[in-house]
Amino acid sequence: MQDRNLIDVNLTSEMKTSFIDYAMSVIVARALPDVRDGLKPVHRRILYGMNELGVTPDKPHKKSARITGDVMGKYHPHGDSSIYEAMVRMAQWWSYRHMLVDGHGNFGSMDGDGAAAQRYTEARMSKIALELLRDINKNTVNFQDNYDGSEREPVVLPARFPNLLVNGATGIAVGMATNIPPHNLAESIDAVKMVMEHPDCTTRELMEVIPGPDFPTGALVMGRSGIHRAYDTGKGSIVLRSRTEIETTQTGRERIVVTEFPYGVNKTKVHEHIVRLAQEKRLEGITAVRDESSREGVRFVIEIRREASATVILNNLFKLTSLQTNFSFNMLAIENGVPKILSLRQIIDNYISYQKEVIIRRTRFDKDKAEARAHILEGLLIALDHLDEVIAIIRNSETDVIAQTELMSRFDLSERQSQAILDMRLRRLTGLERDKIQSEYDDLLALIADLSDILAKPERIITIIKEEMDEIKRKYANPRRTELMVGEVLSLEDEDLIEEEDVLITLSNKGYIKRLAQDEFRAQKRGGRGVQGTGVNNDDFVRELVSTSTHDTLLFFTNFGRVYRLKAYEIPEYGRTAKGLPIVNLLKLEDGETIQTIINARKEETAGKSFFFTTKQGIVKRTEVSEFNNIRQNGLRALKLKEGDQLINVLLTSGQDDIIIGTHSGYSVRFNEASIRNMGRSATGVRGVKLREDDRVVGASRIRDNQEVLVITENGFGKRTSATDYPTKGRGGKGIKTANITPKNGQLAGLVTVDGTEDIMVITNKGVIIRTNVANISQTGRATLGVKIMKLDADAKIVTFTLVQPEDSSIAEINTDRENSISKNKDN
């Protein structure tokens, strides 16, 4: 048997209809503000409920639970938590530009702390909130039934100031959202007045009086083009940046102090984010982060390491954290019951139109009230003019109804007038009372004439709106908090914040790197101490020295065939006596990975050039410098190495240079690099020298005929030979003898080309470092034994050596382009 209470419906149709009904309910009745008063229904009901409850600024605070319960029971049946959260937000100085609720107790913080439970807090309306409800009892707005028909509530509040602009709005509806920023009260009122005075004004002209948002938390707005676009179209984006300053402590360290955060930014989350970035090494140079905020204001301190640049770190903080954010305008509001994206001008026009309606309705209400009172007074005056006759009619009437009828008939009075005469007390029959009534009647006639004039003249309505807003401005306006910066925010690179200056980069044999100002280096050079003033220990020495600029890019090639990049300014600056920073703190090197060569990749010097790679197994490769323009933070493969092979060094070449390669068994090969075509980064390369059994490459250099070839053997023998003794041949051969290897002098430790003025630093397998000038080493023929250049212990052997600058040389003599390779043999 079919149940007559069941109705068959199409599921698809029902879903569409029900969802549309739900969506429109959320859009119109919950999530979006009305363009007229700038309030969502929940905020409007809270303020109206508080007003009806008498929780006004001149009365004591009331428990929040009482307020939310009253609002929920009468007007907003959606749960007390949503009502309380909305009320809390209206009481937070960092959320509302002008708070509409005066909270007493814990109402949260801008650190994201929640408010105390509603049973613990108290609230009342703020003074400016009264301006939203002023004249609500004068028929200025329409009322509607509440959800169950037991109460009446306003459809919209009179809103005597442009609240939508002043406090903004945020909300997410179904398929749409609104995000309207707050503005300065005085500027918003001035903008409304400008439109009333100059209806044809443009958005740009409006921005002369309302230049941009004014957030309660202050901060900086970077640039104005985004503001103009948003005001013109209702949609746009601006960049908000924290207000910061860099302080210098008494110890000379720098610290970044944040005093204002962008609107809506959680200070605690920023703190956690910065700490996490520092721990993950994504942000170097920060030693501590403290929140020193108090009742006196926000103070967020970021301590900077002594050698780090606070300006660079601050720039990275803007890039990586919420110290700089984007605020996206989406000025969506309810206009005539329909959600619509509105421009600034449309918001103001709607507000002006609404205020005209409010003033007209209020004026009509006052006029009707005055006319009703004047009507009564007119009857009283008639009665007083015929007092004896009136008294006689009343005395001779059996009932008040008969008396009222007689009075109406005799003096042509209305029912209300006759009733007022009957209700009049005897004391009002005196002559003085008659004068008072006459005076009140005359005043009412003047008032009625004035109110009628207002209704007849639209310009007077405009004047009233302006005068009343000026009074609100005088009482509640305060200075702008958000500063508008001229010019757009640029995506600044760190080097934009670093002064370009000439510097020296040094890398020690043990991997300590630092940056020195060249001026300081020159000063200590004149003192005659040379590179000994570079702060290394007795068991360490400067192995790489590069003259560069703070804006230049340095490439670091490792024995694993990888390349890393650093800007010179990213290398910490130290004094000349300081040791420096372990390079593993700057580059993500793997275990056993060491820097073989540092090359300055300045575009002017590397344009059209190539990198020439040489490996321990005799493989060579030439790759254009342009292949290395984009190097990731964790490095890039520079060449593919075979198993067991290592990169010996990298040379910056012109494409037509001669190259000489030396091997451990004392052979060398010289060839022109043009015989090798340019290859990609992933290529392995070609054979540069054919190695004998158990042989390996120990050095490679660019070579010119006016240079000399310096070789040093494991047992402390060395010699210089003219480059002309090394003929240019094809690559890939076994090479010719460059030294006569015997048990006496030992295998070749390294080969390098020299000009004859350099010093060399030699290190043994015992860690002993010996320094001597190249000129002290004898010149001999190519296939000779060499001469003893240093005395070694019985079990000591030379494992590597490198060229360094002579102690008495000037800065101009430093070999900045690093033509010569560094002889290395660390794997033994």
Curated annotation (Swiss-Prot):
GO MF term set: ATP binding; DNA binding; DNA negative supercoiling activity
CDD domains found in the cross-reference section: TOP4c
Residue span(s) of domain Topo IIA-type catalytic: 32-497
Keyword line: ATP-binding, Cytoplasm, DNA-binding, Isomerase, Nucleotide-binding, Topoisomerase
UniProt cross-references to PROSITE patterns, sorted A to Z: TOPO_IIA (PS52040)
Gene Ontology cellular component terms for the protein in this record: chromosome; cytoplasm; DNA topoisomerase type II (double strand cut, ATP-hydrolyzing) complex
The EC number(s) this enzyme carries: 5.6.2.2
Active site: 120
Compartments where located: Cytoplasm
GO BP annotation list: DNA topological change; DNA-templated DNA replication
Pfam families: DNA_gyraseA_C, DNA_topoisoIV
Motif (GyrA-box): 524-530
Catalytic activity line of the entry: ATP-dependent breakage, passage and rejoining of double-stranded DNA
Database matches in InterPro entries: GyrA, GyrA/parC_rep, Gyrase/topoIV_suA_C, Topo_IIA-like_dom_sf, Topo_IIA_A/C_ab, Topo_IIA_A_a_sf, Topo_IIA_dom_A, Type_II_DNA_Topoisomerases
PANTHER family (alphabetical): DNA GYRASE SUBUNIT A, CHLOROPLASTIC_MITOCHONDRIAL (PTHR43493:SF5), DNA GYRASE/TOPOISOMERASE SUBUNIT A (PTHR43493)
Record's function text: A type II topoisomerase that negatively supercoils closed circular double-stranded (ds) DNA in an ATP-dependent manner to modulate DNA topology and maintain chromosomes in an underwound state. Negative supercoiling favors strand separation, and DNA replication, transcription, recombination and repair, all of which involve strand separation. Also able to catalyze the interconversion of other topological isomers of dsDNA rings, including catenanes and knotted rings. Type II topoisomerases break and join 2 DNA strands simultaneously in an ATP-dependent manner.
Subunit: Heterotetramer, composed of two GyrA and two GyrB chains. In the heterotetramer, GyrA contains the active site tyrosine that forms a transient covalent intermediate with DNA, while GyrB binds cofactors and catalyzes ATP hydrolysis.
Recorded family membership: Belongs to the type II topoisomerase GyrA/ParC subunit family.
Other facts noted in the record for this chain: Few gyrases are as efficient as E.coli at forming negative supercoils. Not all organisms have 2 type II topoisomerases; in organisms with a single type II topoisomerase this enzyme also has to decatenate newly replicated chromosomes.
Protein name as catalogued: DNA gyrase subunit A
Protein species of origin: Streptococcus pyogenes serotype M18 (strain MGAS8232)
